[in-house]
A protein has these predicted regions:
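Nucleic-acid endo/exonuclease domains
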Residues: 1-115
């Protein structure tokens, strides 16, 4: 049991000789949210990132899963920063692993910006 209250409820069910299962079912749920890309250049969405929070990484994976047809690219302030202090993974490595093109803000490829 995960909490004292759950233990108390289980004890009550046991005392009443109620058949039950504990945490036997996993149910998916979704919290509806919106993503507003920073920039749109033609059909390319540019997401400018300084600090790349775990919640932002989860959000971007969710957006990519729901909209695989979109061309979303990262423009990192510091692409070689680690995603956290205990990781060897950099922002750039994370983007590559998940199929997002990326660049540093000071080196945006011109072919991203002009036809």
């Amino acid at each position: 049991m995960r909490s004292r209250l759950e233990e108390q409820v289980a004890d009550l069910l046991d005392e009443l000789d109620v058949d039950y299962e504990y945490e036997c079912t996993k149910l998916n749920y979704f919290i509806e949210a919106n993503y507003i890309p920073d920039f749109k250049v033609r059909d390319i969405y540019l997401e400018a990132k300084g600090f790349f929070k775990p919640s932002d990484r989860r959000k971007m994976l969710a957006v990519k899963k729901l909209h695989p047809e979109l061309d979303i690219r990262f423009v990192f302030q510091a692409p070689y920063n680690k995603i956290n202090k205990n990781s060897k993974t950099t922002y750039a490595m994370w983007a590559e692993k998940h199929g997002f093109p990326w660049c540093a803000y000071y080196a945006i490829p011109l072919n991203w910006l002009k036809p």
